[in-house]
A protein has these predicted regions:
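Sec-dependent N-terminal signal peptides
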Residues: 1-10
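Catalytic glycan-binding domains that act on GlcNAc-containing polysaccharides
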Residues: 9-161
Length: 161
């Protein structure tokens, strides 16, 4: 119980005040795990916020699942998932979700079109996002993620260890 109360206190101190307890717990795990893999927790948290509001159990109309809205038809099947419910459960678990998002991000980093600020665009629209009919929406998404990551970095510098 004491550990739980400490976690809630730390969450209040370290996260936006509008985060609910389940969001704070997921955020804590995302930040911790992202630091373990030498990722940018501000960027990951920005993606998680834009994609799912850091809420588990989310499913989009396009078949994207969990905290980072990982696409089942592409990534889930590629990773051998046969059951959408199992995929949703795993992508809603922040430990699994960070690994999945890292795989997607690392795959996108292989492409020149995904350099720098365009990494968020690639996360959303794939490496050929520039040729997409949704290019404007993808750029808007990318700008939102990058601005939020920058704001998180400014407001929560201690997220990065």
């Amino acid at each position: 119980m004491l550990l739980y109360l400490m976690m809630v206190f730390l969450a209040e101190y370290n996260y936006p005040s509008h985060f609910k307890i389940d969001q704070r717990i997921s955020a804590e795990i995302i930040i911790e795990q992202t630091n373990k893999i030498s990722g940018d927790p501000h960027f990951y948290m920005a993606i998680a916020w834009v994609e799912s509001r850091v809420k588990s159990g989310r499913v989009s109309h396009t078949g994207d699942y969990g905290l980072f809205q990982i696409n089942y038809n592409f990534w889930g099947k590629k990773w051998g998932y046969k059951d959408r419910n199992k995929f949703l459960k795993d992508m809603s678990n922040p430990y699994h979700a960070v690994i999945a998002a890292t795989i997607v991000i690392n795959e996108m980093k292989r492409y020149k079109a995904c350099d720098g600020l365009h990494l968020a665009a690639c996360y959303n629209g794939g490496p050929n996002w520039k040729n997409s009919k949704n290019k404007d929406k993808i750029l808007k998404y990318s700008n939102k993620v990058n601005c939020l990551a920058k704001a998180y970095k400014r407001k929560y510098p201690k997220w990065k260890k």
